[in-house]
């Protein structure tokens, strides 16, 4: 059994080296005693909410008002019957305000929280299968439910405690989860939750019966691990929002067409071809145009003979591993890019963007000879080859010429691949008959 909280929270006694007497503890610059001494006394009625406020207004519960008191909601770690309900209003008045424990168990700072480590409720308050015991712990843990952590801050909450304890699930976006201050152990009291949260905990931690005192170490590790991951994600989001809000490098270069803001003129220059449609960097092998020289250099690898990355399913080889990863989506049937208008899915993001232009109905690139319009400028560039009879890509089987290598491959796949496969089937049937 753990020691009483008064023993745990007693100040450390230092012995004098010469006299052997207990030396007075060294006063810290930011000790709890000094913090509490500099603040005003809390108002009477520590758990009284402001009843006269309008709906939606914030109700302040005065539990040690000078110190942000963070009390997470923690589910029972025991085998709980789903039908075992508890009158949490009565539990709140009896256990937290110390009517059962006596005045000696109350906090020395008059915050109204029962600091007694071991206390029992009457049988009328504790149904069978429930163990009502607040756990004093030195770390703030949150009950994980569907990837979320639920906290309850008595200082910055607009919810009355009985409403919360009667089973109201509060998302982290509704609750102000303030950073922990250096508090004594009793300010981190865990309140036992109702059967709804207990059922969620049972699903997440499917363990058999275990002692009625504390959580298993594996469960604490699991909760702390998820709590750390949530903190990291929150920090990354906060950093991203801070950068977008102008706290970082100022973004002063704005695109006059779409209003997008950039932090350097070079980035704005690279962005402008998106609106002008200019693709000045053209591949000499296939004629495909690019907005940036770096993209052209990366594209040139396609035309080399070396293809070290092979697909394990079909044996097709690729120049780059990223192209292989995109190709694997075809075998898996994975189309992550879905059109918002028609629901059509695509394996590649580029094809998805090109498809979305068909829904806009805007074809700003027109041919000066036949007035045929296109969504993208490189389609117009390839279309111009039809007027000057320039078809650099020729089919080796039938001799038909094409303006793009893509059209040549599509032609071979639709016509000649079927013919070759049918011929091979005929040869196999002839050998079988002979």
Curated annotation (Swiss-Prot):
Record's subcellular location: Nucleus
Zinc finger motifs (C2H2-type), residue ranges: 253-275, 281-303, 309-331, 337-359, 365-387, 393-416
Motif Engrailed homology 1 repressor, residue numbers: 27-42
Molecular-function GO terms, alphabetical: DNA-binding transcription factor activity; DNA-binding transcription factor activity, RNA polymerase II-specific; RNA polymerase II cis-regulatory region sequence-specific DNA binding; zinc ion binding
Function: Transcription repressor. Component of the regulatory cascade that controls the development of dopaminergic (DA) and serotonergic (5HT) neurons.
InterPro entries reported in the protein's UniProt record: Znf_C2H2_sf, Znf_C2H2_type
Annotated SUPFAM superfamilies: beta-beta-alpha zinc fingers
Keywords, alphabetical: Developmental protein, Differentiation, DNA-binding, Metal-binding, Neurogenesis, Nucleus, Repeat, Repressor, Transcription, Transcription regulation, Zinc, Zinc-finger
GO biological process, one term: nervous system development
Primary localization: nucleus
Gene3D superfamilies: Classic Zinc Finger (3.30.160.60)
Species of the source: Xenopus laevis
Family note: Belongs to the krueppel C2H2-type zinc-finger protein family.
One cellular component term from this protein's GO annotations in UniProt: nucleus
Thylakoid keyword on record: no
Protein name: Fez family zinc finger protein 2
């Amino acid at each position: 059994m753990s020691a009483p909280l008064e023993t745990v929270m007693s100040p450390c006694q230092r012995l004098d080296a010469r006299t052997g007497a207990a030396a007075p503890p060294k006063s810290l610059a930011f000790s709890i005693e000094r913090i509490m001494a500099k603040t005003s006394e809390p108002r009477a009625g520590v758990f009284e909410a402001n009843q006269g406020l309008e709906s939606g207004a914030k109700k302040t519960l005065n539990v040690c008002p000078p110190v942000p008191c963070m009390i997470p909601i923690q589910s029972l770690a025991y085998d709980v019957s789903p039908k075992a309900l508890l009158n949490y209003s009565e539990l709140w008045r009896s256990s937290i305000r110390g009517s059962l424990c006596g005045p000696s168990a109350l906090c020395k700072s008059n915050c109204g929280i029962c600091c007694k480590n071991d206390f029992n409720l009457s049988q009328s308050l504790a149904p069978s299968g429930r163990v009502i015991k607040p756990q004093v712990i030195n770390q703030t843990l949150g009950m994980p439910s569907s990837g979320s952590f639920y906290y309850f801050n008595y200082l910055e909450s607009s919810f009355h405690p009985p409403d919360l304890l009667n089973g109201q699930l509060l998302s982290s976006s509704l609750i102000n989860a303030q950073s922990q201050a250096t508090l004594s152990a009793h300010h981190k009291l865990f309140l036992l939750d109702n059967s709804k949260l207990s059922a969620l905990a049972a699903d997440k931690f499917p363990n058999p019966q275990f002692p009625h005192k504390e959580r298993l170490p594996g469960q604490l590790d699991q909760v702390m691990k998820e709590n750390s991951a949530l903190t990291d994600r929150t920090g990354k989001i906060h950093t991203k929002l801070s950068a977008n809000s102008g706290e970082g490098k100022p973004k002063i270069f704005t695109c006059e067409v779409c209003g997008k803001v950039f932090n350097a003129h070079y980035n704005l220059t690279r962005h402008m071809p998106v609106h002008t449609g200019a693709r000045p960097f053209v591949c000499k092998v296939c004629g495909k145009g690019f907005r940036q020289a770096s993209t052209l250099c990366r594209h040139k690898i396609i035309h080399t003979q070396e293809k070290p990355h092979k697909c394990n399913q079909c044996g097709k080889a690729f120049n780059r591993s990223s192209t292989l990863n995109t190709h694997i989506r075809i075998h898996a049937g994975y189309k992550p890019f879905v059109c918002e208008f028609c629901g059509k899915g695509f394996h590649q993001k580029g094809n998805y963007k090109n498809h979305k232009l068909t829904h806009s109905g805007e074809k700003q690139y027109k041919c000066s000879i036949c007035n045929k319009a296109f969504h993208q400028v490189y389609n117009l560039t390839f279309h111009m080859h039809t007027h000057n009879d320039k078809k650099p890509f020729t089919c080796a089987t039938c001799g038909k010429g094409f303006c793009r290598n893509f059209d040549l491959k599509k032609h071979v796949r639709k016509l000649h691949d079927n013919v070759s496969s049918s011929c091979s089937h005929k040869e196999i049937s002839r050998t079988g008959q002979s």
